[in-house]
Structure formats: C-alpha cells, structure tokens
Amino acid sequence: MDKIFFVGVIIGILSRLMMLHLDQKQYPTEPNILLSQIVLSFVASALGALLVPALIERSYTSITFLSLAAQQFRQVRDNRRDTLQNLEDVQLIQRGNSFIEEIARTYEVRNYTCIITSFLTVGLYYILISEFRLSDIMSIIVSSLGGLALAFILKKSLERDSIGDIADVVPVDISFVNESIMQIGDLKGITNIGLEADRQKYLSQGLGIEIIPKDKSYSNSGILYDPGQRQAIIYNIYSRIGIKREDNEPAFYPLPRMNLNKGSLVIAVVPIDKDINKLIEAVKSCPILSSAKGKNVSLKNYKIDEKGSI
C-alpha cells in the first residue's frame, strides 16, 4: 500500500511536470508559480492515489474529498484569472479576456490530470495483484508504465492547435497612401499616421505580415476574425519579440485588420527584435482559443471566392 501510494503520487506529479512550459515567455515561469503548481499537483496526485484503496474498503465518503478538490481547483482557476486581469492595466499590450480565460482554464484542467494518472496507476496495481496474481514489484512496474502512458496520452490530447495549423503567415510590405494612410500588403486604410516621424519609423523599422487561412476555409478565416483571437496573436508577438512603443504612443499599437476579400488578417508592428522569421514563428505558435472556434461551422464546406459547397 505504502509503495504504490508513493508511486502513484510520483506518476501524478510527473504528469503535471510534463505539461509545464519552462520557457521564460510561457506560463508558469516565475519560481513561485512553478512551486505552487508542484504543490497543487502533489495534492491532486495524493487524492487520486488514496481514492482506490478507499473505494476498495467501501469508504464512499471519500468521494466528498474529490468534490472538495474540484472546488479548490476551480478556485485556482479564479485566482489565476483575477491575477492576470489585474495586470491588464499595466501591460503595454493586453492579453484580452478570451486569452486570460483560456490560461485560467488550462491551469484548472491540468491539475485534474494528476488525479486521473495517479488513480489509474494505483487502480491498475490492485487489478494486477488481485486478478492476475503478479508479484508486488512486477505490478508496480507495469502500473507505473501504464500511468506514464496515460500521462503521455493526456498531454497529447490536451495540446491545442495553433495558428500555424490553420493559416499560412507571409511577410508583406508596409506603405502609406495619400501621405498618411497606412497600407499593409494590398489592404489600404489600416489607420491614419499623422506624424512624419512615426511614418518613417514604420517604414524603416516596421514589419508587416499577412495571415492567410489554409485551403481558403471560411472556418479558419472565422477564427482569425474573432476579436479575442486577434488580441492573443498581438500579445504573442509582444511576448516573443517585443514592440517598440510607450504607453502614450497609440500610433505603434498593432491594429490587426481583416481583408474581407481574401479572408486574411494583416498586422504591422515595430518590433524590438526586427526578425521577420521570429515574427512569423510568434504568430504561428499562438494557440487557437476555444472561444474562437465553432463560430462558422455552417460554412465549413464553403471556400473563400468560390460559390457553392465542396
């Protein structure tokens, strides 16, 4: 009992560590957040490991602890949401409510993976011992491998699609028409940049991109059209390569605009790190938000610039 309990806890914690992004541009990053996630994963794994022997002993009141754990993890989600929303006012580029909700939901769901993997590890151990009459050591080894396999499956299933999966990102030129009206690629009228110095900064230091939905799909274009998804793309650019602007410089705030004829999205930025390849990668790696999906399901069989369904 003692051995398999600790094995189940370790497997549960490992399942959480597998999903942690330790890149400084991702979450969790800071040591205090990392520590809190490890502690929460320990609590969740211990609950999952204890649940099996409790059920074997017909102690059904143990289900109460699961409900308390679920409530606690929902509180973690609320706390993460509140923390990120409180930081919005001091961000040069905001994440947006949709992106914040996605992050908070991810924090909650990934704690449940600890319960599932530790529960399966301990449960498989008892099945091997009682039904297949395997030795204690062999049962621990097999159940550990089963728990790790489940952890990999959960990690794969919880991976979100990114912009690179639904769209191509290509560089385009930034220019100005009628002296001060910004044009990105072939889309005019993005915004009015009144100061000559600001226009020169865009022309000399700016980068333009066009995000083109793959297969001319209306569904993919609809994801790009979502305001929350656009804001997430801008924030991902800001977090990866930076943006040259002060809080009192609205001219350099990126304004994504849809080209309705092509269903594409164009963006002009003045990055700190002027590298078009890094900019393209930042856009492609942006996760697709759950709130941006499914809004154009009825048009999934239609193509942009084509009549009728395919």
Residue ranges of model-derived segments:
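Long, non-transmembrane cytosolic or organellar matrix-exposed soluble domains/tails
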Residues: R257-I310
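Long, charge-rich C-terminal accessory regions
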Residues: I129, R133-L134, M138-L279
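Alpha-helical transmembrane segments and their membrane-interface exit regions
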Residues: I13-M19, L66-D78, S144-K155
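A cytosolic-side transmembrane-helix exit/cap motif
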Residues: N79-L92, E159-V169
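Short membrane-interface loop/juxtamembrane segments of multi-pass integral membrane proteins
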Residues: E88-T106
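Membrane-anchoring hydrophobic segments
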Residues: M1-R58, S62
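Select subsegments of transmembrane alpha-helices in polytopic membrane proteins
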Residues: L35-L40, I103-I116
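Alpha-helical transmembrane segments and their membrane-interface junctions
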Residues: I63, C114-I140
